Amino acid sequence: MTDLVALEHIAVAFGRKAVLHDISFTLRHGHILTLLSPNGAGKSTLVWVVLSLIAPDARTIRRQPKLRVGYVPQKIHIDPTLPLTVERFMRLHPGVKKGDIGPALARVQAQHLHQAPMQKLSGGEMQWVLLARALLNSPQLLVLDEPTQGVDVNGQVALYDLIDNLRHTLGYGVLMVSHDLHLVMAKIDEMLCLNRHICCSGTPEVVSAHPDFIAMFGYRESSQLAIYRHHHNHRHDLQGEVMPAAQPHGECRHD
């Protein structure tokens, strides 16, 4: 499995405040890694390091040459008075042609939003549009910062199905960042629990039972960690509704 980004013993401090200490992990082709941590534990800073937006104080970082990265931000603010359709928003991406937009939206089952006003999108629709935009440069690595924020449970299930499909069909490496314990994707390859340093790592089942994880989130909260497993034989749309049987779910993989 090809390494896309490898971090070894990363440390970041802002002034005298240590934000990250001794962080090591590897993002690989076809590999899904979830970073789970409470607010204020350094996860945004770590995302910036992965995206090369800040340089750590202590570092060994190896990247695949000419690595293409697609980024889905935690949120995006758009002036409500700005007349901006989904198509025009996606064309703001450098080098994008009009003909690139339809296929990107279709890949995430959002082609019907092509001419929709950005300001009128639901939380789930906005996430799908941001994901489609991240796919425009044919990335090798997807970085998703709180991708389920503002999305209901059915929408989260649909998003997890899509991410799993993308990594299998296109071989993307995926870094997902979250502070939400309510629903975690079971098919991730590795979960890291972060609180300025990596407290524990492993599968969701292993991490959820780790003493450091329980100490960080509390017994009550950590015991509520829900792991989503794909057991259905149908597909959800952007709103979480079951799609008609006439639309095949041939890309689906079952446990």
Curated annotation (Swiss-Prot):
GO biological process annotation, one example: response to zinc ion
Pfam families, per database record: ABC_tran
Compartments in which it is found: Cell inner membrane
Annotated catalysed reactions: Zn(2+)(out) + ATP(in) + H2O(in) = Zn(2+)(in) + ADP(in) + phosphate(in) + H(+)(in)
Example of a GO MF term: ATP hydrolysis activity
Alphabetical list of PROSITE patterns matching this protein: ABC_TRANSPORTER_2 (PS50893), ZNUC (PS51298)
Similarity annotation: Belongs to the ABC transporter superfamily. Zinc importer (TC 3.A.1.15.5) family.
Assembly behavior: The complex is composed of two ATP-binding proteins (ZnuC), two transmembrane proteins (ZnuB) and a solute-binding protein (ZnuA).
Full protein name: Zinc import ATP-binding protein ZnuC
Species assigned in the record: Sodalis glossinidius (strain morsitans)
Organism taxonomic ancestry: Bacteria, Pseudomonadati, Pseudomonadota, Gammaproteobacteria, Enterobacterales
